[in-house]
Structures are given as C-alpha cells and as structure tokens.
From Swiss-Prot:
This is Phospholipid hydroperoxide glutathione peroxidase. InterPro entries: Glutathione_peroxidase (IPR000889), GPX_AS (IPR029759), GPX_CS (IPR029760), Thioredoxin-like_sf (IPR036249). Keywords: Cytoplasm, Developmental protein, Lipid metabolism, Mitochondrion, Oxidoreductase, Peroxidase, Phosphoprotein, Selenocysteine, Transit peptide. Its EC number is 1.11.1.12, 1.11.1.9. The active site is at U73. The keyword Transit peptide applies. It comes from Sus scrofa. The gene is GPX4. Essential antioxidant peroxidase that directly reduces phospholipid hydroperoxide even if they are incorporated in membranes and lipoproteins. Can also reduce fatty acid hydroperoxide, cholesterol hydroperoxide and thymine hydroperoxide. Plays a key role in protecting cells from oxidative damage by preventing membrane lipid peroxidation. Required to prevent cells from ferroptosis, a non-apoptotic cell death resulting from an iron-dependent accumulation of lipid reactive oxygen species. SUPFAM superfamilies: Thioredoxin-like (SSF52833). It is an enzyme of class 1 (oxidoreductase). Belongs to the glutathione peroxidase family. It catalyses: a hydroperoxy polyunsaturated fatty acid + 2 glutathione = a hydroxy polyunsaturated fatty acid + glutathione disulfide + H2O; 2 glutathione + H2O2 = glutathione disulfide + 2 H2O; tert-butyl hydroperoxide + 2 glutathione = tert-butanol + glutathione disulfide + H2O; cumene hydroperoxide + 2 glutathione = 2-phenylpropan-2-ol + glutathione disulfide + H2O. One of its GO terms (cellular component) is mitochondrion. Transmembrane segments: none annotated.
C-alpha cells in the first residue's frame, strides 16, 4: 500500500489526534467540539427530558428514528400520533424513537422540559424524550451537527434542518441510513423499517 493511500485512509483519525480504536474514539471524538470525528450515533450523549445525561451507546443494536419535535406546530398532531403508533407496533422488534424538542422554527416549542413532557403524555408517548436543544447553528447539539453531514443525512437544499419533525433513520450500528423531510409523515418510514430491523 502506498504512503499516499495510507494517509488518505488515516487522515480523518489523525486529525482527531488518535487512531479509531473501538471505545476510545467515542470518548475522544464525540465531545461538543469534536463531533466530526464520530463514526456513529453511539458516540454521543444527550440530556433526557428529566435532565439526566444519557449515553446514546444504549441504542447499540436498535434501529432508531431521531426527530426534532414541537408542540405548537401544524404537523404536531399527525407526527406525535404516528410516532406513538410506530413505537407501539415496532418497539418489540427493536425500534427506538428519540424525540428532541426544538424551539428554532416559529418558536413552536416555547415550554420548559416539564411542560413538554406533560404535553407528550397527552399523546401517551412511551418513546424517549430528550431535553430541548438547537438543531441548527453554532449552538446545535453535536449529534444533530453530525447527522446532517452524514452521506445519507444530507438535505435536499443544504444540510440545515428546515422545520419541525425532520426525521433520521439510524441503523443498528448507529449510522444514518435515511433522512426524511418535515412534510414526510412518520408512516412513510414504516416501509423502510424491514430492511433494518
């Protein structure tokens, strides 16, 4: 193997300051500033709706739908209803849903985490709710920065999240396999699930 080919293969990990050793990459590369070095969703952590830090490695071996949510959007009812339905029918098959409240689009998620949790309970939400975050800009959560630049996570007109209820399908290895725009209802994802569950 030529030196130039070897360098091209190792360049991403050398820029992080470490070779990608399983386990080590997650602790070294998935910090707030080093999200570009992550190889899977499992290298990130996020606060749940109750304020507890969750290591997303707990989703290893599960297929996940990751979505930004809002309680005052015109798409709220259909998305919450269909996400609850998907979770009820596929959780036993290995589907997990991670919902991240976000107030960046029309200020349609203005409440506190406690208020958002109470709102979601009205839909009988059993899937995992996380603390309110930003999904765009410098303050975007590192997971969302990472998902948007993955080969299958890129958007149609730029990578920025366009609105509430943008959804990412994540495989069992923590890799983005598809991005769904805010106009695509959760039931659209169902046809893709058998390939990954």
């Amino acid at each position: 193997m030529s030196f130039s080919r070897l360098f091209r293969l190792l360049k991403p990990t050398l820029l992080c300051g470490t070779l990608a050793v399983p386990g080590l990459a997650g602790t070294m590369c998935a910090s707030r500033d080093d999200w570009r070095c992550a190889r899977s969703m499992h290298e990130f952590s996020a606060k749940d709706i109750d304020g507890h830090m969750v290591n997303l490695d707990k989703y290893r071996g599960y297929v996940c739908i990751v979505t930004n949510v809002a309680s005052q959007u015109g798409k709220t009812e259909v998305n919450y209803t269909q996400l609850v339905d998907l979770h009820a029918r596929y959780a036993e098959c290995g589907l997990r849903i991670l919902a991240f409240p976000c107030n960046q689009f029309g200020r349609q998620e203005p409440g506190s985490d406690a208020e958002i949790k109470e709102f979601a309970a009205g839909y009988n939400v059993k899937f995992d709710m996380f603390s309110k975050i930003c999904v765009n800009g410098d303050d975007a959560h590192p997971l969302w920065k990472w998902m948007k630049v993955q080969p299958k996570g890129r958007g149609m007109l730029g990578n920025a999240i366009k609105w509430n209820f943008t959804k990412f399908l994540i495989d069992k290895n923590g890799c983005v396999v598809k991005r769904y725009g805010p106009m695509e209802e959760p039931q659209v994802i169902e046809k893709d699930l058998p390939c990954y569950l």
